[in-house]
Amino acid sequence: MKHGALALVVVLVLACVALAGDHPLLVTPAWLTERLDRADLRIVDLSDAEDYAKGHIPGALHLDLADARMQASEGVFRLPTAEEGRRLLARLGITRDTTVVLYDDEGGLHAAWLFLVLDVLGHPRVSILDGGSQRWRAGGGAWTTELPDVPRSRVVPTLRPQSDSVAGASWVRDRLDRRDVALVDARSWDEYTGRDLRARRGGHIPGAVNIEWKRHLQADGTFKPLAELRQMYQAERVTPDKTVVTYCQTHHRAAHTYFVLRLLGYPRVVAYTGSWAEWGNRADLPLER
């Protein structure tokens, strides 16, 4: 019966991925090239400002990651509130009907954070460019230093924030013994085991499995095939029938994990944004090494 239920979940997950249709979460340079002239397209470049000034995809706006990553306390970051998010979208000229494509030059690391922000805010059409600027340029994609003239949106986007996609330490602690919850630590193995100490305490949240975010990528910075990514997670018993909690040190790297799980169609992915910067500095929370 268990196997039958899991099989049904997998079928539903695959169906959800297939239903992405004209709006896949991960897009290729060819896909983007065909849509560069569309008025409802907004491209956001999350590379360093200096690199953006040297060249970017035509029409791309630059966004400093810090503008979408708010500091909650020392070393701990949070997502923008709904109001902060609406202001950010208005500044970028993004409405609910805009198709948003994100890219960087870090294997999608920075783009994944903004994907998380927009996904939690409830924007329905957000994608990441596979391979980022490197793959785009390697394939002969158009490149410019011209700054786009994008007016602020006069319409404040009306979205439906997904508040159940973000969790705090108490929420995570209260679910540590639940078999229907899986925790994924996106940090390095040395951080996971406590050898690389970046908080008062080293180690990991009890029960968490270590799948470093870099394992999602191939040598050229593109994402591994979906089948390989799916096997990677299922081998660690991180299956679609569970609520999956993602974390790292500050949830920057874990945003990459959040994106991959969404890409794979996992229906319940929860970002613990406090991550180890919070958990590792609180003596009242349990840990393992």
Protein language model regions, located:
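Bacterial N-terminal signal peptides
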Residues: 7-17
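Active-site neighborhoods of enzymes that stabilize oxyanions during catalysis
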Residues: 21-25, 34, 69-71, 133-206, ...
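Helix-loop module immediately N-terminal to the HCX5R catalytic loop
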Residues: 70-99, 213-244
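Thiolate-centered catalytic microenvironments shared by cysteine-dependent enzyme domains
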Residues: 79-171, 175, 196, 253-270, ...
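C-terminal soluble interaction/assembly domains
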Residues: 231-289
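Mature N-terminal segment immediately following signal peptide/propeptide cleavage
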Residues: 23-49, 59-62
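Bacterial N-terminal signal peptides that target proteins for export
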Residues: 1-6, 251
